[in-house]
């Protein structure tokens, strides 16, 4: 069975397992039915009638909420070897998000376009996740 960073809505955050492999954060979910549509494995999406974009959007927002609630060990990005005190409101973390699928690790980057502007607590771009202090 494939593992994914997408969550079923009924799956509570404490059922989520985060682990780091080669610098990538892996989020496992044994329950998700929409993940197969995301990686194109040819399996059914579980009979859901929602459009693919809607399922991707819902899944990405769910994974963001799960990551924001989880305690993830990451190293802050320092400039010139010292903390950047000018940006005390936010800290930048270099995080590589990815899915774990049947064919191995699938980079998360192709799905960033599915995030709406202005997430609740963070701004996500291709290379970093900015968390509030």
UniProtKB/Swiss-Prot annotation:
Subcellular location: Plastid, Chloroplast
InterPro entries registered for this protein in UniProt: Uncharacterised_Ycf68
Organism: Oryza sativa subsp. indica (Rice)
Family: Belongs to the ycf68 family.
Keyword annotations: Chloroplast, Plastid
Signal peptide: none
UniProt name for this protein: Uncharacterized protein ycf68
A GO cellular component annotation in the UniProt record: chloroplast
Pfam families the record matches: DUF2647
Predominant location category: plastid
